[in-house]
């Protein structure tokens, strides 16, 4: 159970004693489990890009990098960052990963899921274009230019998704795009 990837979800800020007990439990587990999730903080984060409807009982995918409505899943695509990649190289990779993820977001007809899963997923088409290997990169692992590079790559992802959504293919624009997630295992493989 200690490695089950579970989190406790608070609707608001927990009292200090409750939070400290959670923190001590997290420390004692030596595994990073269980996670602590605040639904109110998630609602505030969702409101930041002004493309998503607030007020849902938010949760996340198992690694907690994507905020999801109840009965919703997202589409993750991964960009492998090499230490020698230039900003232009990475923007091209993000462009293609966004195309793949956007097209993948249309694959929602799973016969074994209730209709609400299909409805929620199609309404938002949440897309995670993640970067694996950022800590090995000569720029992204530093604080000097990394924020600008990340912002430029985010713009490529949003613009690419918008282009696909407005060209008559019948794909709705994603309500949220991009993420940086813990990809330690993946980055070791690639």
Language-model features and meaning:
Residues 19-21, 60, 170-173:
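Short solvent-exposed loop/turn micro-motifs enriched in small/polar/acidic residues
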Residues 33, 71-73, 172-175, 183-185:
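Active-site lining segments that contact anionic ligands and/or coordinate catalytic metals
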Residues 26, 175-190:
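Active-site and channel-lining beta-strand-loop segments
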